[in-house]
Amino acid sequence: MAIKRAAFNPAVRAETDLHDCALRLARVQDGHQRFGLFVRLSALQAGLRREHHLRLAAAVFDPILRRFEAQLFGLSNGDLMLITKDVPVLELDNLTAKLRGMFADDPMVYSTGQDGIGFATMFDIRRSPSDFLGLCETILADALARHQTIPSPAKKTSGRTDDSSRLTAQSLASICEGL
């Protein structure tokens, strides 16, 4: 799937940055182990998608971000994508377990969506960069569709202003009387 960027859309900045990163990683063959951990917070029940829940979920990644070479993308729909370099799989499994524990009240945490992606899905970028790039393209396309603005039809004006919207001495007097 090819994504064309017509114009910069700040509403999908994280998705655009993620897609750019995935494009670069698809070309890199340096022998480093790279993983992508996609956390689908947008599929949780509405009560668990509040702003403070999203902040707490992002904070779970802080130890990884401090100790390893990693980058966290907070997407516009609330989902998170962590891209890591040379992080042990056990560390990522521990993160996933913490996140599942935080949102254990939601049945989606332990199920898989129709697209085969569950609550937390790990991608081995080094072994299958095309799968990861495909996911990132889908994420970007969905975000662009979600934030697409439909221009309203232009108003036809004859150059005259509507008399009812003018402030006149009479309308001002009637306003003052009403007070």
Features from the language model and the residues they span:
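Regulatory and interdomain segments flanking nucleotide-handling catalytic cores
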Residues: 1-179
